[in-house]
Amino acid sequence: MPVMRMLKIRFIDSIIERIAERVSNRVADLLEQRALFFSETKKLFDQPETDSGAIVCAGGQLIHQRNEIECMSYAKVIGELPPPQHPPEVPRRRSELCKQADFSLDAYRYWSSALRLPLTLHRKHWEFFYICQALHERGFLSTGRTGLAFGVGREPLPALFASLGCAIVATDQVSDDASRDGWQITGQHADSVAALEKPNICAPPTFRERVSFEAVDMNSIPVHLAGRFDFCWSACCLEHLGSLGHGLRFIENSLNTLKIGGVAVHTTEFNLLSNAATLETPGLSIYRRCDIEGLVRQLEEMGHHVEPLNLNPGATLIDGYIDLPPYHEEPHLRLRIAEYDCTSIGLIITRGT
């Protein structure tokens, strides 16, 4: 090959390499910005907004008037019934999606009252109800039981469980990481046991006796927590661990903290629109049916028991509404994240031998 032609080819190759490098760097920058955006947006999901905005029906109909949205409050849809005095008997919880039907249960009113939460059609309140009910009906919310909370934030659950006689180790990420990721500025991070006190739920002396705090990385659970607890839980945390795989590995690893026969209850984001395409960024991932079903198969092959999946999304009016930013106090059972409609899913897993 002539020398001049070889030089031209090398020159062209060098230009192509430079262009490819610039494109690669630009794509990386865009992915980082996209991940940051969705991570910051997700931090607002559990802090209901009261600003006027729009709710979109699954069929595509927009409702712009705030007074129309207010017509779908808990009181208007379910009623204003008082909470029962004792935990009612209800069908045993399965691994399932958040649905309107659960908000009409006496058990939802009971646990909302116990947690000092207002009755509202909000999926975060459903997650708390789901965790409480799942643990209660399996006999874990009683004196002498031990529980471990992951990514606890400012949840009222440790205070409630302590008031019922449980000893709780509450964990959250280290303060520097929480500050970097934006959880402190939104008031969704705990760095001490004092941050979790709820005097209207549990008397302070009892709380301080039964609740302790540790900083824990959910991607690297310390060995000293292994095999110590009757139950563990997390409420919409594992989707923030870095990827779909990181969250699934956390669920598997969380079982190592349990005694044999102990129960883990975890909630996370579920993709209602697609079993193929989904959102996966360092700050936020949305789980598909295939991800959940694959996890169930894996855990059961390892000898654990997963409560049967019920992925019926419900068929009521509220089940069909998708909340758009700025998000509302209610109804907020389904919401739009990027191009995906999603809701909360709860998983109940018993550690096997």
PLM region spans:
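Membrane-proximal basic amphipathic "stem/tether" segments
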Residues: 1-74
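Conserved alpha-helix/loop element of class I SAM-dependent methyltransferases that forms part
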Residues: 125-144
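Class I SAM-dependent methyltransferase SAM/SAH-binding core
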Residues: 148, 155-221
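A C-terminal cap/extension of S-adenosyl-L-methionine-dependent methyltransferases
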Residues: 213, 308-353
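A short acidic, Gly/Pro-enriched loop at the edge of an enzyme's catalytic core
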Residues: 219-232
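A short glycine-rich, Lys/Arg-flanked "PGG" loop and its adjoining helix->strand segment in the class I
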Residues: 245-262
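Conserved beta-strand signature within the Rossmann-like core of class I S-adenosyl-L-methionine
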Residues: 261-269
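Conserved Class I S-adenosyl-L-methionine
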Residues: 275-311
